Amino acid sequence: TKMFEIEFPLFAFTHCRDVVVAVSKAGGFGVYAAGGLTNEQFEIDLKWIDNEIGGRPYGVDLLIPNKSLAQDEEFDSEKLKAMIPKEYGDFRADILEKHGIDGSDFRSFEQDDERGMGLAKNTKEEGSKNIVDIALSHPISLIVNALGVPPFWLLELAKEKGIKVGAMIGSSKHAIKQAEAGVDLLIASGTEAGGHTGEVSTMVLIPEIFEAIKPYGDIPILAAGGIMNGQQMAAAMAMGAGGAWCGSVWLTTIESELPLVMKEKMIEANSSQTIRSKSRTGKHSRQLVSSWTEAWEAPDALEPLPMPLQTMVTDPPLIKAFKLAEGGHEGAKELVTYWVGQGVGLLKHSISASDVVQEFKEGFIDGYERLHEFMQE
């Protein structure tokens, strides 16, 4: 709270600009995920946030991998498409057709448009620098890299502008590397988390990292992974975290960018209905189980390709499936999936993002008072 002058240390990772604004205005801290956005869309969205947020602090989350296929080469969509074996086109088309969707356009990659390539562009060195330049031209307070140690040039640029740099980590080894690199904030993401995540649970990870980084000074830790309410947040802070970083809890909010069909699937799901798989991006990421994920986990499935090629395989057919699912297509409804953590089982209704923040505050106080009562007895 001191680092960013906020009322409550609840950080909202989200692909929805409305959630960023709502959470920051409610006393938390909104973090906008650039993900696969084009430079133009990212600029438009940050301008909108600047106009709506009323001077409250916010941040951005970027995907800048330290290991990506031909990362230092200029982005060339045709060259990347040519690197994808033809059987991947047939495989994705077959999945669609088994669910009553025409897959003929997806048997080759020639017709794939730029929609599925935002992530591929942004993980190239030139694309990474472009997206960072856009972010730094706005009054952000935090920039987070979600894939490995931030490049030196990013740390230097942020420092010049007085912007804090955070990093996602999934082990104490990663925490030490980030601390040595000079990051200001660590987001310790347990395996319960949605999206790209490691194998260690949040309950184990927080105290382990808390001890591991003591020699490096007072670097705040945000707990991430499975945290869906204020009581869990209080528990994480009792273990050494300075706040909570949450993503899944915003997915079913009224403001969320997700289509209604996806929100309904999440509200109906239990905590066992997620899977950590390489099938979406080429790196392990947790998502809701669906017919699409099951097809990639089958014994006869193809091995996922490295980032960014796997995203280029999966995004175009899933974009089509989402459109059809919104129109009521039953096969498409079975296929659609989205990144979400194991805490999905705690998503029971759709409320506003500001109401989620308020519920977190109340739950945090309840959790704190419960612990205090034990000490009084």
Give the predicted meaning of each segment.
Residues 1-216:
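Active-site entrance/lid segments in N-terminal catalytic domains of soluble metabolic enzymes
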Residues 13, 32, 145, 223-224, ...:
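Thr-Gly-centered strand-to-loop micro-motif
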